[in-house]
Amino acid sequence: MGDITNYAIPFFALTLLLELGISIYGKRKYYTNKDTWASLIMGVGSIGTTLLMKGFKFGIFTVLYSFKAVDIPMVGWGLVALLLADDFTAYWVHRTSHRVRYFWASHVVHHSSTHYNLSTALRQTWTGELSGSFWFYAWMPLVGFPPIWILTAGSVSLIYQYWIHTEAIKTLPSPIEFIFNTPSHHRVHHSRDVKYLDKNYGAILIVWDRIFGTFINEEDHPEYGLVENIDTYNPLRIAFAEWGVILKDVWIAPGFFTKLKYVFAPPGYSHDGSRKTTDQLQAEARLKKVAEQSGKL
């Protein structure tokens, strides 16, 4: 148990090659060489930092587990509860990673590709665990989930999320689309289109988005990437670009609280209006739509 993602590497490789073949022979342009290599290098680097933090994280969870409220058996209902607890937490980690710039600085890596394919799933942060995102899961050992099983559930979630990074699958039967995260739902999440920004955070289940008001169906075909793309294939720049911009913003920002906002406010925050957050961009889009509709009356 624990990190079982290594066992999935052959599956990752085979399916990536299959999708690449579909892209080449179907002339669908899912892949470009530089983008794919950048994604793969980011994935390898992520494995290194994840392994570096694995023992530390397991140690923290083990200490917390010694104060557990109850013993949750890892059979039957206990396994179901584990997966639901992990998925619920993953939703909020993901949502926070889009709404708090400190965490976005790591997560932005995963959204930095302007393509959407299985290699994009492997484009992972080098700083996510180092930034302390694992603390969101600290409640689970305190409740009574064994640490090794918490790590296992996280691996299961990552493996599930791999296959939804594809354009080769359009939509699935409606009951599946209603309950689970699917390629269609996740394509929306990777879009840079204003109406799609900060939507569909779900990991395995999409029901959390439906419950908490962050769900949107795929309508128009998404344009992938960031609101302002970083336009580089350099792995070091991909990994650390946003951290560098944060440091620059903090350095030049006037006043202590403004400096804090550049770290912890939503991405796009600026004290002088030079940049815009998702909320601001979407508010402008709504006003523009209302104005256009009014002009037609």
Task: Set out the residue ranges of the language-model regions.
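Membrane-embedded catalytic scaffold of the fatty acid hydroxylase/desaturase
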Residues: 44-53, 68, 72-224
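Hydrophobic transmembrane alpha-helical segments in integral membrane proteins
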Residues: 1-12
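Membrane-helix exit/interface motif
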Residues: 55-64, 68
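Central hydrophobic cores of alpha-helical transmembrane segments in multi-pass inner-membrane proteins
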Residues: 11-23, 57-58, 83-89
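Membrane-interface helix-loop junction between the first two transmembrane segments
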Residues: 17-38
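Cytosolic/stromal cytosol-facing helical appendages immediately following the last transmembrane segment
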Residues: 5, 115-120, 166-297
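Short, hydrophobic transmembrane alpha-helix segments
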Residues: 1-3, 25, 64-67
